[in-house]
Amino acid sequence: MSDRFVYVTYIRTTPDKLWQALTDAAFTREYWWGMFLESDWKKGSPWAMKFNDGRLNTTGEVLESDPPRRLVLDWHNEYNPDLIGDGPSRATFEIEQLGEMAKLTVTHEAQPKLLNAVSGGWPKVLASLKSYLETGKALPNPANCPTAKESAA
């Protein structure tokens, strides 16, 4: 894993609530546009990200789990055929309490093709997570939103 994407955001929430939002299927469905995660989140356990209809998107193993501070996942794309051959990657979630907010740092290490895909996806997902935790309302899925140019047409 030669390349790395790092995203840092500050969310008005507690580390416990943020951990729950990252690991609880009911939470992830709300801000990840129907996607949900399944695992017991113990070190060595399998985990899976699934579409709302149950199809697999991503699978892997929980490499580290220290609630509510650190979660490290082995990450295997199962859905996009162009990315399956890019090999496994690693996603690390670090949570730190800062007064009334939690600092979330997401680091994703991957080969270039997969890294390009996740570096476009993480900002959207994490912005929606932040909105959901702070306002109770997730952002719309950017894939379903017209651009300004399309709206003007």
Model regions: which residues?
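Beta-strand/loop substructures that line and gate deep hydrophobic ligand-binding cavities in soluble
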Residues: 78-124, 129-131
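Structured surface interface patches that mediate subunit assembly and partner/cofactor docking
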Residues: 42, 110, 124-153
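Hydrophobic/aromatic beta-strand elements that line small-molecule binding cavities or substrate pockets
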Residues: 9, 59-64, 89-96
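Short beta-edge strand/loop motif at the mouth of beta-sheet-based domains
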Residues: 6-7, 13, 17, 23-59, ...
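Hydrophobic pocket/interface hotspot
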Residues: 18-19, 28, 47, 62, ...
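Exposed loop/turn and edge beta-strand positions of beta-sandwich/beta-sheet ligand-binding modules
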Residues: 1, 5, 56, 89
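A short, structured loop/turn motif at beta-sheet edges
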Residues: 15-16, 63-70, 94-103
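Short, charged/polar surface micro-motifs in flexible loops or helix N-caps
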Residues: 53-56, 64-71, 77-79
